[in-house]
Amino acid sequence: MAAMVNAADAPDAEVPYENQSSWTDRLEISVGLTEDLEPTISALTVQPLQQDADGRNTVFTQLSHFSYEQFDDRKNTTNLGLGFRNVSEDNSLLIGANIFYDYEWEEGHQRLGFGLEAKMDRLEFTLNFYDAISDEKAIDANVDELALDGYDVTLRTQLPYMPWATLGLQYYEWDSIDFDDIEGTKISLDMNLTENMDLELGLSDDNDSDSTIFANFTYNFGGNSSRPNMSDGYDTEAFVTGSDMRDHNLDKVRRQNKIITERDSSGVTISRKN
């Protein structure tokens, strides 16, 4: 996460802004598990392409690769993203837009993604749309597989007195071709364990399958010594206020990086959720 001079220290002057110089400072590795114990392993980085000296306008790229289990097969998907973020003059609000290209290597599925986001004290909002652009793929003589269109909307907020913990609530929908659309919700708790390590715990539930408990462990190589973490304990104030959103202009875009697919086997459609 970026380092900066607090706006409160220089209220009448243009505040200089600095970013970490090493690209590895914005590299993270994640391992995720669900109840079936099949791991999702990923690497993700966010890098600035162009940024104003005051840090209020940022063009960035987000690159990631995910390896995960789907239909009892190991899938690998690469995500290439381009985004723009703007921070308000008082540094209290960040708004952004992004576009992604997703490619799944095993079957050649392709997808475009479009996203909007807004961040302020105690609250984050993201809206993502997913548009599959590849044709149906023949897995074998009797099985076809198709990437699905969809969207998700997410709200995240800090928990009272715990600035190192964030509660997230997401609604998602995937457009099935032959059966009912997949509609579901996801609730999660994201905790900063240390300046480098995060733990996310959650529950996903939809009309396609049983509820699923999940956990994601993330290690960030750069870390951030100024961000609150669990060892700080509880805060004396319910919510942190006065945050400078320029600290978040190189946060990762939160989206579904896996390509969700549907299989048709001898007339029976099988779907896979988040």
Model regions and ranges:
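Transmembrane beta-strands of outer-membrane beta-barrel pores
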Residues: V31-L37, L63-F71, F84-N86, Y101-W105, ...
